[in-house]
C-alpha cells in the first residue's frame, strides 16, 4: 500500500494534472492507496449518512492524542475524496480537526466546482461526520 502524500504535495500533484480527467484519475489513485477496512469495520456506526454512495469512516486516537482515520466507499471517486479528506486531517488531534477548515484547501484545488452536487453533498457529510466523531473524542 503506497503512502498518501502530505497536504502540500497533494496540492502540487493536483496542480500538475493537465485537465480534470487527469485530476479525477489522480483522486481515484489516492483512493486505491487507502488501507482496507476489516469486515467488522463495515458496521452501522461507521457508515456516513448523507452520501449517495456507501461510505464508512473509522476514527481512532493514539496514546499521544493523534487521530487516525480509515475509510472506504463502494465508489472509486468517492473513495478518492475520502483519501483527500484524510490527507487534510493527517496528524491532527481531535481538537485540531474540529478547528481546521478544509474548505480553503478544496478551493485551492478547485475541487467543489468540479464535483456533481451529490458528490459535494457527500463530501460535506463526510466532513461533518469526521468533525462530530472528533468532538465525541475530545
Swiss-Prot record:
Gene for this chain: sufE
Q: Which Pfam families match?
A: SufE
Q: Which organism is it from?
A: Klebsiella pneumoniae (strain 342)
Compartment list = Cytoplasm
Q: Which residues form the active site?
A: 51
Q: Which Gene3D superfamilies match?
A: 3.90.1010.10
Entry annotated with the keyword Cell cycle:
no
- UniProt-listed GO biological process terms: iron-sulfur cluster assembly; sulfur compound metabolic process
Subunit structure, per the record?
Homodimer. Interacts with SufS.
Record InterPro entries: Cysteine_desulfuration_SufE, Fe-S_metab-assoc_dom
The family this protein is said to belong to: Belongs to the SufE family.
Protein name (record): Cysteine desulfuration protein SufE
Q: What top-level branch of life does the organism fall under? A: Bacteria
Q: What does this protein do?
A: Participates in cysteine desulfuration mediated by SufS. Cysteine desulfuration mobilizes sulfur from L-cysteine to yield L-alanine and constitutes an essential step in sulfur metabolism for biosynthesis of a variety of sulfur-containing biomolecules. Functions as a sulfur acceptor for SufS, by mediating the direct transfer of the sulfur atom from the S-sulfanylcysteine of SufS, an intermediate product of cysteine desulfuration process.
Q: Please tell me whether the keyword Nucleotide-binding is annotated for this protein.
A: no
Stored PANTHER family:
CYSTEINE DESULFURATION PROTEIN SUFE, SULFUR ACCEPTOR PROTEIN CSDE
Q: What are the alphabetically sorted keywords of the record?
A: Cytoplasm
